[in-house]
């Protein structure tokens, strides 16, 4: 059933679509370990299994298990982290059983644009861009408010955009014993660079920070563009968080 769930996530299918897909596609059946004579799980069975995974937050556990395997294989060699956050929009329609919008979703602003939904906070390593941790909250949370949850104590350097300016001075980081050894390579606000030439040393330093930090944007591109998860699928942050964590594993 777990393989069926991963297939459903990878191909962005509803429960009925997944049931039909297993009937029609022999390769999918083989991947799921189903012989031709085996009974194919119907949509209610697929739904119940997904609810079981959500109840025990197994999406997060699977992500941690995969990361442990990557670390033990020596693929994450750096103690640097890149942090960033991105909005996941929530449907504005009230055409549902309660005739209300999801109470866990909220509105947040980026630049001059308002977003209604939730926010995905992510940390990756600074060499390959592998997701090392992720937390989720309402859209009105500031990016920096969840940064401490993303960064392990042994982290030596942290990259982030201008939304994380002053991160190292926050109380939750000051109580960290390793904070004194850590460097925070945070991009300056755009206005600071105004009027500086392309050859200016400060601008070159900022360009280097951005060239490292762009790796975390690939995570958002995969989730929101390749996997088409621009909008929430379910009501509540926890259910959507489970699906996004599973997407990162896939």
Task: Locate predicted features.
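Alpha-helical support elements that line or immediately flank enzyme active sites
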Residues: 2-12
